[in-house]
């Protein structure tokens, strides 16, 4: 559950019952899990980072699906995971279990609670270009402060600006 004020996340609450992890965050109170304060990891190196992302449900009609980005970061980090739920991925970044997150094609209700968690845990949440995140845009970076610029740069440079190519022929979507 996320509460926003003027388009920005303010409060966040999230439960991951399978792991017995309730999370919550509020301005001035920080971010918490199971009654203990949490914070983002101290990772500052893309090469040492462990990232997480997601993919749109319909890869054949979403040509901006995330394959090029996934390939780019997979070869430049310790690894990239695919968690499945944006809010949980963001909670894991807030807790320092993962170092960074990016994804596109999301709705405000996917992001609001997790954004509040990351920010209150000392992380950075932004648009792909590094500007302030916009819930309505559906795309987001969330990470440690030291990883923001490498993620912004990677997202800007991982695919050709003009073509339909995803950076590697084997990653291009099938033609109908």
For the regions a protein language model found, what residue spans apply to each?
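An extended, acidic
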Residues: 39-176
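DPxDG-like acidic metal-binding loop motif
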Residues: 1-32
């Amino acid at each position: 559950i996320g509460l926003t004020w003027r388009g920005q996340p303010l409060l966040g609450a999230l439960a991951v019952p399978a792991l017995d992890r309730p999370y919550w965050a509020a301005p001035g109170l920080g971010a918490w899990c199971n009654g203990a304060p949490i914070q983002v990891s101290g990772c500052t190196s893309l090469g040492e980072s462990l990232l997480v992302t997601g993919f749109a449900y319909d890869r054949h009609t979403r040509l901006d699906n995330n394959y090029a980005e996934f390939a780019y970061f997979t070869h430049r980090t310790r690894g990239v995971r695919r968690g499945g739920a944006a809010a949980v991925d963001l909670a894991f970044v807030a807790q320092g279990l993962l170092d960074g997150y990016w994804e596109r094609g999301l709705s405000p209700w996917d992001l609001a609670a997790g954004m509040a968690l990351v920010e209150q845990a000392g992380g950075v949440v932004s648009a792909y270009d590094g500007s302030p995140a916009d819930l309505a845009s559906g795309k987001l970076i969330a990470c440690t402060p030291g990883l923001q610029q490498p993620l912004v740069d990677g997202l800007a440079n991982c695919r050709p600006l003009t073509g339909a190519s995803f950076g590697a022929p084997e990653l291009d979507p099938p033609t109908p």
